[in-house]
């Protein structure tokens, strides 16, 4: 029996494996493709102002951010997830943390990615870095 298969390494995504918040990059990606209305951007900026001052809870901030997906088809976003990963996320992976991911993979440990971000944005990361499990936000459609 391989004892290493019973060891798991857990990695947080935002501001750990990824040097920045993925939500900001996601909004930038949507904005660059003209897929997000200006009103939504304004709403996020105002909410973020209050969130940064701890006047808005994590839960409320997430609810505000997720309003973007209301009445939209998830498949439209899933189609661009791989390109988003390659262009926006992969270049911002933290080298030191990435080295730890590779170390644990080489040791035969299970790799678990944890994030509050949505699944479709994280699946390309999981595939590319060969994570074994993903714990994240699933959108209800």
Predicted regions mapped to residue ranges:
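Active-site neighborhood of HAD-like aspartate-dependent phosphohydrolases
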Residues: 1-53
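Residue-level signature of catalytic and energy-coupling elements of molecular machines
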Residues: 15, 77, 115
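Hydrophobic packing residues within well-ordered alpha-helices of enzyme cores
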Residues: 26, 97, 122-126
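Conserved alpha/beta cores of soluble small-molecule-handling proteins
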Residues: 35-36, 52-56, 74-76, 95, ...
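Short, compositionally biased "basic patch" segments
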Residues: 47-53, 62-74, 133-134, 138
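Metal-dependent phosphoesterase signature
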Residues: 60-96
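Short, acidic loop-to-helix structural element flanking the phosphoryl-transfer center
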Residues: 82-119
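Substrate-recognition/cap helix-loop segment adjacent to the acidic, metal-dependent catalytic center
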Residues: 106, 110, 117-141
């Amino acid at each position: 029996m391989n004892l290493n298969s019973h060891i798991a390494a857990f990695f947080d995504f935002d501001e750990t494996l990824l040097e920045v918040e993925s939500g900001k990059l996601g909004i930038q990606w949507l904005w660059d493709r003209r897929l997000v209305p200006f009103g939504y951007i304004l709403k996020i900026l105002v909410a973020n102002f209050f969130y940064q001052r701890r006047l808005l809870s994590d839960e409320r901030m997430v609810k505000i951010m997720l309003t973007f997906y209301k009445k939209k088809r998830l498949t439209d976003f899933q189609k661009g997830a791989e390109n988003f990963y390659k262009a926006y996320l992969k270049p911002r992976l933290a080298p030191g943390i990435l080295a730890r991911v590779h170390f644990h993979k080489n040791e035969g440990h299970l790799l678990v990615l944890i994030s509050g971000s949505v699944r479709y944005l994280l699946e390309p990361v999981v595939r590319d870095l060969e994570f074994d499990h993903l714990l994240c936000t699933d959108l209800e459609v």
